[in-house]
Amino acid sequence: MHEKNLKISKLCEAIQAKQYRVARVFGDPAGYQMQSSVGMGEADLFRQITGWPVISRMDKYSRSIQSGISHVRQFMMSADGTKRLHIDHKCTGIVEDLESYRYPEHKEGSHLKNDPLKDGYHDHGCDSLRYGLCGRFPIRKQKYRVDKL
């Protein structure tokens, strides 16, 4: 759903109205942080309204934006050229979001910024894709063998 500042209750209503066959729900680990206005996190509120628990990876690799983006890129095309992520042509929202994902321009002499720009619209689809892939296929710490010369 592409709406700015969508309240969790409205999101739940929209999802339930579509009558999706939901197997799992993946979300932002920050969704479990308590909101003072309701006394619970958005993930807890989502579960209370829909009955579906929100799966969030809490390890440092999955919480890292850069690691998560790298993980998604590996699904888009691995080093050997294999594509493991296929997006249906009817999913126009996520396609638009992926095409609109941007990074800040690098200025000579300044630090390179690794985090993407957040426009509050296109970044949500990309973030949700990252949460889903990191939740379903967790990032594993890679061990490399180094041969001595």
Where would I find each of the regions flagged by the language model?
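Mg2+-dependent endonuclease catalytic cores in nucleic-acid-processing enzymes, primarily RNase H-like
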Residues: 1-117, 137-140, 144-149
